From Swiss-Prot:
Entry's family note: Belongs to the radical SAM superfamily. Lipoyl synthase family.
Keyword tags: 4Fe-4S, Cytoplasm, Iron, Iron-sulfur, Metal-binding, S-adenosyl-L-methionine, Transferase
Pathway assigned in UniProt: Protein modification; protein lipoylation via endogenous pathway; protein N(6)-(lipoyl)lysine from octanoyl-[acyl-carrier-protein]: step 2/2
Substrates-to-products reaction catalysed: [[Fe-S] cluster scaffold protein carrying a second [4Fe-4S](2+) cluster] + N(6)-octanoyl-L-lysyl-[protein] + 2 oxidized [2Fe-2S]-[ferredoxin] + 2 S-adenosyl-L-methionine + 4 H(+) = [[Fe-S] cluster scaffold protein] + N(6)-[(R)-dihydrolipoyl]-L-lysyl-[protein] + 4 Fe(3+) + 2 hydrogen sulfide + 2 5'-deoxyadenosine + 2 L-methionine + 2 reduced [2Fe-2S]-[ferredoxin]
SUPFAM superfamilies xrefs: Radical SAM enzymes
Cofactor note: Binds 2 [4Fe-4S] clusters per subunit. One cluster is coordinated with 3 cysteines and an exchangeable S-adenosyl-L-methionine.
Descriptive protein name: Lipoyl synthase
Length: 298
C-alpha cells in the first residue's frame, strides 16, 4: 500500500487536522453537568481533539475509577501515579449524567487499575447495570483495560450485558516495548477473542504516527479480523505535550481510506478510519452502521 504521508523531521500539523472550535451553550452545559456531578471524562483527561465537537453535541465519554492511572503508556495524557479507592457512588452519578443528557449511546472507559484484584471489573459492571436501568433504550459501550489477562474479570463485565466491548490494541506489537511497556499485544487479542466467544460485539482500535509503517497496520488489521472484531477504529496520533513521543508521520486521509478498505477486505464488518477518529468518537454511528450491515441481505 502506498502511503502519501508527511514524515519530515520537523512536522507541521497538516490542514486536515486543524479543528474549528465551536461556540455553543451546549458545550458549557455539558461540561458543567459532568463537573457538577464530580465525574471525569476521557475527552478532557486525554486532551481529545474532538472534545469541543462532542461536548457541543451533548455527548461525552465517561472515565470511571478516577483520573490517575497505574500504568504509564507513552502516548497517553492521563496522569500515572497514586490512585484512590473506587467511589461506590460513581456508577449512580454516571447514570444520572447520562439520563440528564438524554444519551442514546453511552460510552464508559476507565484508567487501568492494576492495584485492584479484579482490575475494576465489578465497578464497570455496576456502572453498566445502573445505565441500563436509567436508560433502558440506550446502548452501552465499554472501553476496558486488559485486566492483566484475568478471564474472571472479563466475565464479570460481560455478565452485566454491555452492548459493545471495546479494547484497544493501540499500536503494532513491535512497538509495545516503547509505547505500551506494561501491556501485552497477544493478551489483548485473547481478550477480544473471549468477548466474541461470549457472544459480544467486539471493538478495537489503533493509532498511526508512532513509528509504525503501513505493512504493520495491515498486520494488526489481520490479527483483529482473526479475532472476529466487529468494529475497528484507526486515527492519527497527536502528541499531547512535549513530554510525549513526537509524531513520526502525519498520515494522509487517502491512506486512512485505504486502511479501511484493507480491513473490510479481511472481513472486519465496520472500519472507521480517518485522521480525527478516536475509539469513542461517533461511537453511536459506528454501532448503528454495524447493525445496518447485519440486517442487510447478503
Amino acid at each position: 500500500m502506498s502511503s502519501p504521508d508527511n514524515s519530515s523531521p520537523s512536522l507541521r500539523i497538516p490542514p486536515w487536522l486543524r479543528v474549528k472550535l465551536p461556540c455553543s451553550h451546549t458545550f458549557a452545559d455539558t461540561r458543567a453537568l459532568v463537573e457538577g456531578l464530580g465525574l471525569n471524562t476521557v475527552c478532557n483527561s486525554a486532551k481529545c481533539p474532538n472534545m469541543f465537537e462532542c461536548f457541543s453535541s451533548g455527548t461525552a465519554t465517561f472515565l470511571i475509577l478516577g483520573n490517575v492511572c497505574t500504568r504509564n503508556c507513552a502516548f497517553c495524557n492521563i496522569t500515572p501515579g497514586h490512585v484512590s479507592p473506587p467511589d461506590p457512588d460513581e456508577p449512580r452519578r454516571v447514570a444520572e449524567a447520562a439520563a440528564r443528557l438524554a444519551l442514546r449511546h453511552v460510552v464508559v472507559t476507565s484508567v487501568t487499575r492494576d492495584d485492584l484484584d479484579d482490575g475494576g471489573a465489578a465497578h464497570f459492571a455496576a456502572t453498566i447495570t445502573r445505565l441500563r436501568a436509567a436508560l433502558p433504550a440506550a446502548t452501552v459501550e465499554v472501553l476496558i483495560p486488559d485486566f492483566r489477562g484475568d478471564h474472571a474479570a472479563l466475565r464479570t463485565v460481560m455478565a452485566a450485558a454491555p452492548h459493545i466491548v471495546n479494547h484497544n490494541v493501540e499500536t503494532p506489537p513491535a512497538h509495545y516495548a516503547r509505547i505500551r511497556p506494561q501491556a501485552d499485544y497477544r493478551q489483548s487479542l485473547e481478550l477480544l477473542r473471549r468477548v466474541k466467544a461470549a457472544g459480544g460485539v467486539a471493538k478495537s482500535g489503533l493509532m498511526v504516527g508512532l513509528g509504525e509503517n503501513d505493512t504493520e497496520v495491515e498486520g494488526v488489521l489481520a490479527d483483529l479480523a482473526d479475532c472476529g472484531c466487529d468494529i475497528v477504529t484507526i486515527g492519527q496520533y497527536m502528541r499531547p505535550s512535549r513530554q510525549h513521543p513526537p509524531v513520526e508521520r502525519y498520515v494522509h486521509p487517502d491512506t486512512f481510506e485505504s486502511f479501511a478498505a484493507c480491513g473490510r477486505g479481511m472481513g472486519i464488518p465496520f472500519v472507521f478510519s480517518a485522521p480525527l477518529v478516536r475509539s469513542s468518537y461517533n461511537a453511536e454511528s459506528a454501532y448503528n452502521a454495524l447493525c445496518t450491515l447485519r440486517t442487510e441481505p447478503a
